[in-house]
């Protein structure tokens, strides 16, 4: 691991404040100097460059997440292909073929624009065939456990092809057939929903991301949803998509509990069906938020006039034919008829 200090607190930069992966030329960081020294001492024929990647990347023009993205980095601006880079491309073709059996359509080809300061690009230039593996998203795998397995079988396939030299028979053109990755995924996409503003009704799409917020020790997190885009999102996709034609957005109300009334999941579903989205009163919020499907508000909280905008933490109701059938609480879609959801947590609003 190149940056253990950054990994401890989920940040790209090291304790010095440097992005080590932009330090291949200056070698100002001790980590960068160590990596360069190891590469030069080994003069390895092949190298694997493992990265974490946002889960919002997809295989281009598909709704499939780019669970893994591969790249044989360019070593110059012209993106020339010499034997060193070509060998990396050939191995990637075999890796992709194997992974397709476990995650069909969920492999992308990372952008190969040359970055002269990056280690991957320079290690390729220094003579080691470099294979970048970016680990993106996989449905219902927030901790990337399934993606770890795909990394394992992917690297195993690569090592076998190197040991047997089977990669040498691969046609380079097959590398270009791997779809490029794109960044057009939302956690939740609501399509064609009706939204009333200033007396007029509009039909639009809503795209939501679940942003992770760490606790003080970085040992746990809660999610805070945010609207990332509004309007025509027909070229975007969602891990979860609701086709909401005929549904109307209904602003939620605040519920004031009776003395001694306890917040339960059953109570929350009942209140949501009646138009309440917010629970007034003190609740103990854990490190991973409130495991209670209503937003929790303080006595000082004033419910603003309802309006959608990019950056909003979305909480509202959805009705069809006058019946409230769904709720969106902290960006999580809840089917009130089935009382089912992938709900993770609500948040406290002051």
Q: Where is each model-derived feature located?
A:
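Active-site/substrate-binding loop(s) of hydrolase catalytic cores
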Residues: 1-105, 124
